């Protein structure tokens, strides 16, 4: 097989049979030169080179000189003679080389080797089946010299060969090496030299010296060859060399030609070689010229050809792909390829396929090998002609016969046997499994079978349907689950469906032998699930830990369910019953047509492309959604014009696709999906305004609707070749009906309108003219049997079901959202669909009525669906919604919304399982969690009155009314409602959040802020667009035809919608979105950033632009509803919340939002509803929203700004809401507490019902929701994937407060807040929050701890009681914005810091915001905040931006905006959420600087000054140390908590400033970051965090691992109310100091041991406590920073952030994760060892440590949740590897998602107590145990160790030592668990050390005042404290681990 590679290339493109030869011919001048050289070197023919005709099996490369020749040939480029170029009928024959040469201008030499194309030697070698060209005449032209002159290298001999065939002649340029290649090909494949009498050409080196001799020799050679050349020559490479095809046509591509055939063919294969053309490629195939549109440049990465149009040879893979994927039979059936985009015919492929050698022949020659393993299932079945894979059939038959043995499928076979079998199957042989070897190793057969499925490019259950499956199993009842699963299964591509049925029936039979095999269905499901059901997210690097486990759990639940219901699920009966019941025959299975095969084949090839692209782009949000959708062949379909469309198969004509705005490949994706996916959906939506409700609700009700973002279409296209293509329209509709369909619509840009389609066909009208029936059917399919009467069932199915469903405790619904991460777009699209029409037309033109209207109605509908069970009669239309899904659809669809404007409030009590795009989820999660819960309640109460306001809030809060009513309903999670809510407004840009909540006119400043938020929200917010404007809502509602009532109705509806939104979030978060929330988040961020950059007021501005007047009335009702706030604030609040959700959605939506949302939603809902809502019906929820996502907060801020006077009020409200700073925050605080305490992950869900109970207008619940969301997000999202994309999501999730802060600061509280008047905003933010804190001291831990921060000092004392909370809000001012978020932020502390812009916050809240931003977690969530940053950028807050940059983290320290630092601290707590993203932590750290900006900006150092009165430095806990040098570092340790390194910024964030560390001024998160408000509460009791009033500690002051900071623990005078942390009892402080000293000593002693020093802690801090990273400055005050252990800890701890000091949480860690410990520095290394020991001690004293950690976590409200999880994870799981684990940990309760949870509670309490006493009053209050632990931590830190202790604790160095897996910076929970042992180590010297309440210790002791609350700050500079990093960061930046 000479030139096997060449041939292979041609084989790949049989039609281009001669392609390879071209390359030879393409020899460029250089080749000629080479030839010359060769000839000169020797004229002797090498005898050994002459080979008699050999069997074809001999590959040319096998010959010694073959490679040389072939490569020479490959290098050569033919020179096409312009006049002579003829287009043979079979252009494909042309070799790549020749093509390249042709392309090359004249003699321009193109070296193939030069380009990306493979060398000829690497190309496929093939032979033509039939050759008929008569004879060929080859002669050397007479003007050979010219050739060499033409720029060919003089060394190489190049000859112009004239080839004549069939009366035509042309000239090819060939080098001497090319001649040798030709010779070899001819004699290896065609002639025996004895016959040809052609002697082998000598090596070039032997002849190159004598060019003339060479010429003569070649002339003789060609002469002889011409005599014998004839039809015998069927060798592709040889003919290609001559540039002729098997028919004698000249394979010629004009120089102008863009691509040659091979390249064309390649375009269809994985390698996709194409020449680049401006817009299209002209292929001349045979006599047919096909024009293929070139994909856009961004999509042409796979077009290897450079601008020179080099052509490459195709590797054998290409050949295989082409043959495998497009068998000849398929070729004939392939519909005329039509480029969807340009509609040009692409017949090239068909011709190509026809002309290529038969597959059989290629196989016979060994040229073609079909892949079996790793080949797309549809492709494989197509190629093999089997119903199900032969591997499966053979293995199952064998196993059923011989494999009924114990552990079948569980035990693994012998690898060698498995490989043997695999090879046999791959060789297309059916191995005899009955051989003894296999009989003896039966398990190898089972393993092989699993391996086959594991290696499928697209899993059996397909990536596209993953979310749907996970959503379906989260249904409330078995019946519903059955229907949903059935519905999703029906969406599988036929090959997958058949295979699944076969496999499931087999496994089901096998399960009947469980008594023998011990493999019952559960076990079988466990072993099979990962092979059958995978999500891209799970497979992403970011996905690990808890999230992964949760996903696995989901997978096994799905598989087990299918196994248990095989007969039902795969029976035609059920399908018909469901179809009849649902009234949508569309449920029918797509016809299992191989029909799709034609498209499949091409698609397959493309699919490979798409897959590759998807892998490349999938991280990219923009692209990924499409690619993801089109993961399968369909994806390529839309993407690459070359893809052949299947118009005939697809009911939807291409025109439909054209209709889709996206067009191009997006449209193609739609193609893949049922027609409803894109244009069809839109059309349907438009067409069926009335129908949509039912359909939509159905769709949403259907698990797949909710779960998958992709529309069924998309899925179809992906999975199968559009099973729907062949199917009747009904089928397609049915599929589209599924949420996947809806998602699909949203998925596509044009599908944005489709949101309706997805939700209900209400949107269809707007969406163009999709097939109405399809849309209708499609929805019902999802709902399938649900009827309006089923409303009650529906909501629980989704919301409750998910929550209740244990497997879905992941929160299937959130998972849906998550899964919709990419589908976020879906949500966005839905919103955009609704609003895309609007968003595109109106979103950007907020004023656009159209944009508003559809969404508004939609919103109403959404509400209806969400509240369907409880919907009031008022929702006249909604009442119609039969099933929850239907309701949901209604809610989502604008038309429906209109109808449902008055739809009775769907009570959240019946959870709606709506598949919200991740973004929407995020939006919801960020704000709905809080807002929805609150809103729900409010909505119920103010259904009419607050309708409007509710709507307004909805935008901000998802719906203010909804807050009210939703609060109650949202509690149940009204899971999908939030998403729907977005649609209601119709304004939901991409975020899908409806900002309609902002009814009030937005002032320019507000707009600016909003714009900033918009940036943050990105398009998402734009979608919300501040439909918030009442006018817009009004318009939307009015459009509904209820002008006056409409607003109310809309509001009411919206309220439910919001509720739904919240629910959706809460439900969805549990499972991380397989859709790659990160990607969605990134997309959202990118979009928001772009919008922010491009449009100062992109989305939000636009929304703001919307006339707000109409809204005002609604707002007023809201205001009325929340009497506490003036009407304006309420309005503002509602508006802001509306905006906020989009932001969140955008940011968090992808990954964390779902997760976060879930947790948050639940929690928020808990508190939000009544308590918070009343005063702040919408605002409180907004608070939650902030918690949910930075965007949320931003939204809030923007809305308030927009609402100038109201803004302030709203800001105050929003702060309460967003930060639980709002007026109603207090009540919510209690709820928050509840929520916090409740299992963070999704325990909120349970709370939700309670939440609804809170009819009061206290939206504080949002804070709770945030907690819960954070917890969930942490568990589900963070663990799922903390990718660059997720990172944003995480940021959102963890740092929602940050985002909120960002939002608020960004807002500037724009004119108002920025004006420096925080009175309403800032004060309300802080004071209100404080007040709220006071009010809801117990209830809303998150709020409480936030609120204390909110009020600089005024409520400090009062809050001290609520120290747990207050410490958390140590960033009172800055944090207040963020406070509510903080609990939510717990998971994503990094986010807030990142996003906070000092400028924005500066006025009054910036510090808080910045503080949050400072958080390392924030940096971890840098992306999210980056968006904010972008928005803030509009605010032109340099600080903000810096906080964005991961590397800048350090600079935060030097930034003078200390106030923001405080905020950062708040964020830090949320940062703890970050631990899962710890891997991103480095970035996070880098991003700390952004925190820095915010941290430093606004807050004066006054707080810091308060801190300065540290106790004497004699104590390590010289908390009040202001600037001082320690170990050469200046530590400004003012500190109640800060001790040396800690620094309270005016924003009342703690900043651990490590003078030595790089400006690692990181705000230690107060407790907010902690997912658990309860943590915060418990930890904060003692004011763990500085109070807001405390001046921010200068970074220098903050001492992460500063020598000083460690040595001098920050000690705020206990009397210092602001530094809540300081509220330690003196006794505690003393104890703490003593312990700290002792600890430090021990730690130092141990430093040499396991590298578990505080610095060790630092490392863990990095990992576990991104948010708590500040704790990372593990060096205790006393520790001069020599304790390298600290840094080591950080390193060991998973290097979350290098030596990240508490204060440095954001800024400091940007540097090296470990060694970077600014304060850790070198000392870290030695400390590390101590730290390790310390950690061990820590683990040993795990109870102390854990308790402390828990405590700290709570106290680190923001980071708290993240840290505890990390800690536990550290213990139970490697905390570094598992961001999710961390998340889980972050969830106060689900810290470790293990026993540690319990520990966490307990520890939380203990820690809390300690922290209350030390860091937070509450902490100390809680119990001595924890106090003792805290004291220990302090001890570790020596007197100043409390902070340092925190840091270590956060890092859990001890844990690290014990369990490297416990690297989470926040080892709080994990570490505590693990730390049980480690802690002892660390605590060895601490053992007896009873941490004095850190708070108290702050003054005398170290930052314990601060650290104690962290509970994790335990790490002492000695390296003993392991908790330090995680907890400190979490608890309060101020705590900045001043570990010694």
Curated annotation (Swiss-Prot):
Biased composition annotated in UniProt, kind: Basic and acidic residues: 1691-1707, 1736-1755
UniProt region (Disordered), positions on chain: 646-746, 1035-1163, 1219-1264, 1430-1454, 1675-1786
Domain SH3: from-to ranges: 262-324
Highest rank taxon of the organism: Eukaryota
Keyword terms: Cell membrane, Cytoplasm, GTPase activation, Membrane, SH3 domain
Domain characteristics, as noted in the entry: The N-terminal PX domain interacts specifically with phosphatidylinositides.
Name of the protein this chain belongs to: Rho GTPase-activating protein 32
Species this chain originates from: Xenopus laevis
Annotated gene: arhgap32
């Amino acid at each position: 097989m000479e030139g096997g590679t060449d041939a292979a290339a041609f084989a790949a493109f049989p039609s281009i049979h001669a392609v390879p030869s071209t390359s030879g011919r393409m020899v460029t001048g250089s080749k000629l030169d080479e030839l010359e050289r060769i000839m000169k070197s020797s004229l002797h023919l090498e005898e050994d080179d002459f080979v008699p005709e050999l069997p074809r099996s001999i590959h040319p490369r096998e010959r010694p000189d073959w490679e040389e020749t072939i490569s020479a040939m490959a290098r050569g480029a033919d020179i096409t003679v312009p006049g002579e170029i003829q287009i043979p009928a079979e252009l494909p024959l042309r070799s790549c080389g020749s093509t390249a040469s042709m392309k090359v201008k004249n003699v321009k030499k193109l070296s193939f080797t030069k380009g990306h194309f493979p060398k000829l030697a690497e190309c496929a070698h093939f032979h033509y089946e039939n050759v008929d060209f008569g004879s060929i005449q080859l002669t050397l032209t007479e003007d050979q010299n010219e050739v060499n002159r033409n720029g060919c290298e003089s060394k190489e001999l190049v000859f112009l060969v004239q080839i004549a065939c069939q009366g035509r002649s042309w000239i090819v340029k060939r080098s001497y090496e090319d001649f040798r290649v030709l010779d070899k090909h001819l004699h290896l494949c065609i002639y025996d030299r004895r016959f040809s009498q052609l002697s082998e050409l000598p090596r070039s080196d032997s002849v190159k010296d004598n060019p003339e001799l060479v010429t003569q020799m070649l002339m003789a050679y060609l002469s002889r060859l011409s005599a014998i050349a004839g039809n015998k020559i069927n060798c592709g490479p040889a003919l290609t060399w001559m540039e002729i095809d098997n028919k004698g046509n000249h394979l010629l591509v004009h120089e102008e030609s863009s691509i040659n055939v091979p390249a064309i063919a390649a375009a269809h294969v994985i390698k996709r070689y194409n020449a680049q053309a401006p817009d299209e490629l002209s292929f001349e195939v045979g006599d047919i010229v096909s024009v293929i549109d070139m994909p856009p440049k961004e999509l042409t990465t796979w077009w290897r050809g450079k601008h020179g149009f080099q052509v490459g040879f195709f590797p054998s893979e290409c050949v295989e792909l082409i043959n495998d994927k497009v068998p000849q039979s398929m070729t004939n059936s392939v519909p005329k390829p039509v480029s969807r985009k340009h509609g040009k015919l692409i017949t090239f492929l068909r011709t190509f396929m026809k002309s290529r050698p038969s597959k059989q022949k290629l196989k016979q020659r060994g040229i073609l090998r079909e892949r079996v393993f790793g080949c797309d299932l549809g492709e494989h079945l197509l190629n093999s002609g089997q119903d199900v894979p032969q591997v499966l059939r053979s293995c199952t038959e064998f196993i059923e016969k011989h494999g009924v043995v114990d552990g079948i499928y569980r035990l693994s076979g012998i690898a060698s046997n498995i490989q043997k079998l695999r090879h046999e199957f791959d060789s297309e042989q059916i191995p005899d499994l009955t051989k003894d070897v296999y009989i003896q190793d039966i398990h190898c057969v089972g393993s092989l079978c699993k391996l086959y499925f594991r290696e499928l490019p697209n899993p059996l259950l397909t990536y596209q349907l993953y979310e749907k499956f996970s959503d379906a199993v989260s249904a409330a009842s078995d019946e519903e689950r059955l229907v949903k699963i059935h519905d999703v299964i029906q969406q599988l591509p036929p090959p997958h469906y058949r295979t699944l049925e076969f496999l499931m029936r087999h496994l089901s039979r096998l399960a009947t032998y469980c008594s023998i095999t011990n493999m019952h269905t559960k076990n079988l499901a466990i072993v099979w699930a990962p092979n059958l059901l995978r999500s891209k997210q799970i497979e992403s690097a970011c996905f690990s830990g808890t999230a992964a486990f949760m996903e696995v759990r989901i997978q096994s639940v799905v598989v087990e369910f299918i196994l248990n219901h095989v007969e039902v699920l795969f029976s035609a009966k059920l399908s018909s019953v469901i179809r009849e019941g649902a009234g949508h025959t569309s449920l029918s299975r797509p016809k299992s047509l191989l029909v799709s095969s034609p498209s499949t084949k091409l698609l397959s090839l493309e699919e490979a492309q798409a897959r590759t692209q998807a892998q490349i782009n999938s991280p990219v949000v923009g692209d990924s959604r499409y690619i993801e959708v089109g993961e399968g062949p369909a994806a390529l379909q839309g993407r690459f014009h070359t893809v052949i469309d299947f118009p005939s198969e697809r009911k939807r004509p291409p025109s439909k696709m054209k209709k889709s705005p996206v067009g191009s490949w997006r449209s193609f994706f739609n193609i893949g999906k049922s027609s409803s996916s894109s244009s069809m959906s839109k059309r349907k939506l438009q067409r069926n305004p009335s129908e949509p409700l039912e359909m939509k609700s159905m769709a949403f009700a259907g698990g797949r609707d909710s779960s998958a973002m992709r529309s069924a279409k998309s899925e179809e296209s992906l999975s199968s070749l559009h099973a729907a293509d062949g199917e009747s329209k009904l089928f397609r509709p049915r599929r589209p009906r599924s949420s996947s369909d809806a998602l699909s619509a949203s998925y596509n840009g044009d599908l944005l309108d489709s949101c309706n389609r997805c939700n209900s066909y209400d949107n269809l009208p707007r969406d163009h003219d999709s097939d109405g029936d399809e849309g209708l059917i499609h929805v019902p399919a999802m709902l399938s049997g649900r009827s309006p009467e089923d409303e009650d069932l529906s909501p629980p199915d989704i919301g409750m079901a998910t929550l209740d469903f244990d497997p879905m405790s992941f929160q299937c619904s959130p998972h849906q959202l998550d899964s919709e991460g990419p589908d976020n777009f879906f949500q966005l699209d839905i919103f955009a669909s609704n609003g895309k029409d609007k968003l595109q037309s109106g979103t950007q033109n907020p004023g656009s009525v159209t944009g508003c209207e559809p969404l508004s109605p939609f919103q109403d509908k959404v509400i209806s669906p969400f509240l369907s069970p409880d919907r009031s009669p008022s929702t006249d239309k909604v009442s119609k919604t039969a099933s929850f899904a239907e309701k949901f659809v209604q809610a989502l669809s604008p038309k429906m919304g209109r109808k449902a404007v008055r739809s009775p409030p769907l009570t959240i009590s019946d959870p709606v399982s709506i598949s919200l795009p991740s973004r929407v989820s995020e939006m919801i999660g960020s704000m709905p969690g809080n807002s929805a819960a609150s809103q729900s309640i409010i909505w119920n109460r103010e259904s009419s009155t607050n309708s409007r306001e509710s709507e307004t809030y909805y935008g901000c809060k998802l719906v203010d009314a909804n807050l009210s009513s939703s609060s109650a309903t949202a509690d149940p999670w009204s899971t999908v409602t939030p998403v729907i809510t977005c649609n209601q407004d119709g304004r939901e840009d991409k975020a899908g959040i409806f900002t309609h909540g902002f009814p009030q006119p937005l002032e320019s400043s507000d707009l600016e802020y909003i714009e900033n938020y918009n940036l943050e929200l990105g398009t998402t917010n734009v979608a919300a667009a501040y439909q918030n404007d009442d006018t817009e809502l009004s318009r939307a509602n009015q459009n509904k035809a209820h002008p006056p009532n409409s607003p109310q109705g809309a509001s009411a509806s919206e309220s439910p919608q919001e509720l739904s939104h919240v629910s959706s979030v809460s439900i969805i978060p549990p499972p991380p979105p397989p859709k790659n929330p990160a990607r969605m988040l990134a997309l959202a961020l990118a979009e928001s950033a772009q919008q922010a950059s491009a449009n100062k007021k992109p989305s939000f501005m636009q929304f703001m632009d919307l006339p707000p007047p109409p809204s005002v009335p609604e707002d007023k009702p809201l205001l009325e509803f929340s009497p506490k706030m003036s009407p304006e604030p309420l309005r503002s609040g509602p508006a802001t919340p509306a905006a906020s959700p989009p932001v969140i959605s955008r940011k968090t939506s992808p990954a964390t939002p779902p997760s976060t949302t879930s947790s948050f939603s639940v929690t928020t809902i808990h508190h939000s509803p009544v308590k918070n809502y009343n005063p702040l019906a919408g605002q409180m929820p907004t608070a939650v929203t902030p918690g949910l996502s930075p965007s949320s907060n931003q939204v809030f801020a923007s809305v308030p700004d927009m609402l100038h006077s109201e803004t302030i009020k709203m800001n105050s409200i929003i702060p309460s809401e967003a930060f639980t700073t709002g007026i109603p925050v207090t009540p919510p605080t209690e709820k928050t507490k509840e929520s916090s305490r409740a299992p963070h992950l999704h325990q909120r869900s349970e709370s939700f019902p309670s939440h609804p109970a809170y009819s009061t207008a206290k939206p504080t619940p949002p804070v709770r929701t945030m907690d819960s969301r954070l917890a969930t997000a942490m568990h589900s999202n963070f663990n799922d994937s903390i990718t660059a994309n997720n990172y944003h999501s995480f940021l959102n999730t963890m740092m929602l407060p940050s985002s909120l802060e960002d939002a608020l600061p960004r807002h500037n509280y724009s004119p108002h807040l920025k004006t420096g008047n925080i009175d309403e905003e800032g004060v309300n933010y802080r004071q209100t929050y404080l007040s709220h804190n006071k009010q809801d001291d117990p209830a809303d831990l998150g709020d409480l701890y936030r609120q204390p921060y909110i009020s600089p000092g005024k409520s400090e004392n009062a809050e001290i009681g609520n120290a747990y909370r207050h410490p958390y809000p140590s960033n009172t001012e800055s944090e207040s914005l963020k406070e509510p978020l903080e609990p939510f932020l717990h998971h994503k502390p990094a986010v807030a810091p990142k996003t906070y812009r000092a400028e924005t916050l500066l006025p009054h809240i910036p510090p808080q915001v910045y503080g949050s931003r400072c958080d390392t977690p924030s940096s971890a969530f840098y992306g999210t905040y980056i968006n904010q940053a972008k928005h803030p950028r509009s605010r032109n807050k340099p600080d903000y931006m810096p906080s964005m940059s991961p590397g800048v983290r350090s600079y935060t320290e030097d930034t003078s905006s200390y106030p923001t630092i405080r905020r950062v601290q708040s964020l830090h707590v949320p940062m703890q959420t970050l631990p899962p993203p710890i891997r991103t932590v480095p970035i996070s750290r880098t991003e700390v600087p952004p925190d820095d900006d915010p941290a430093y900006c606004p807050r004066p150092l006054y707080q810091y000054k308060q801190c300065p009165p540290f106790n004497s430095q004699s104590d390590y806990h010289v908390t009040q140390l202001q600037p001082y040098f320690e170990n050469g570092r200046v530590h400004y340790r003012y500190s109640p908590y800060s001790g040396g390194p800690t620094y309270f910024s005016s924003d009342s964030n703690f900043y651990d400033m490590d003078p030595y560390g790089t400006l690692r001024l990181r705000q230690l998160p107060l407790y907010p970051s902690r997912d658990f408000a309860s943590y915060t509460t418990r930890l904060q009791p003692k004011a763990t965090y500085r109070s807001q009033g405390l001046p921010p500690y200068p970074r220098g002051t903050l001492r992460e691992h500063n020598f000083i900071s460690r040595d001098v623990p920050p000690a705020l005078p206990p009397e210092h109310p602001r530094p809540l942390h300081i509220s330690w009892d003196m006794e505690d402080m003393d104890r703490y100091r003593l312990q700290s000293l002792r600890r430090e000593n021990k730690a130092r002693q141990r430093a040499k041991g396991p590298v578990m020093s505080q610095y060790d802690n630092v490392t863990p801090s990095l990992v576990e406590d991104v948010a708590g990273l500040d704790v990372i400055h593990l060096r205790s005050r006393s520790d001069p920073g020599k304790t390298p252990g600290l840094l080591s800890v950080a390193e060991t701890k998973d290097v979350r952030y290098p030596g990240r000091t508490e204060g440095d949480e954001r800024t400091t860690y940007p540097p090296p994760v470990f060694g970077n410990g600014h304060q850790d520095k070198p000392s870290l290394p030695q400390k590390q060892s101590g730290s390790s020991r310390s950690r061990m001690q820590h683990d040993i004293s795990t109870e102390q440590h854990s308790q402390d950690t828990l405590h700290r976590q709570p106290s680190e409200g923001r980071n708290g949740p993240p840290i505890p999880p990390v800690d536990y994870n550290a213990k139970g799981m490697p905390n570094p590897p598992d961001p999710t684990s961390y998340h889980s940990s972050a969830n106060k309760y689900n810290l470790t998602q293990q026993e540690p949870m319990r520990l966490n509670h307990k520890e939380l309490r203990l820690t809390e107590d300690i922290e209350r006493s030390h860091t937070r009053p509450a902490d100390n209050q809680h119990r001595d145990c924890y106090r003792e632990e805290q004291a220990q931590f302090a001890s570790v830190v020596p007197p100043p160790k409390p902070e340092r202790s925190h840091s270590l604790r956060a890092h859990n160095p001890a844990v690290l030592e014990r369990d490297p897996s416990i690297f989470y910076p926040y080892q709080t929970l994990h570490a505590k668990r693990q730390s049980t042992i480690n802690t002892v180590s660390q605590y060895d010297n601490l053992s007896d050390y009873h941490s004095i309440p850190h708070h108290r210790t702050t003054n005398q002791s170290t930052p314990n005042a601060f650290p104690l609350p962290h509970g994790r700050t335990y790490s002492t500079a000695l390296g003993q404290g392991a908790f330090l990093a995680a907890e400190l960061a979490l608890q309060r930046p101020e705590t900045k681990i001043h570990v010694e």
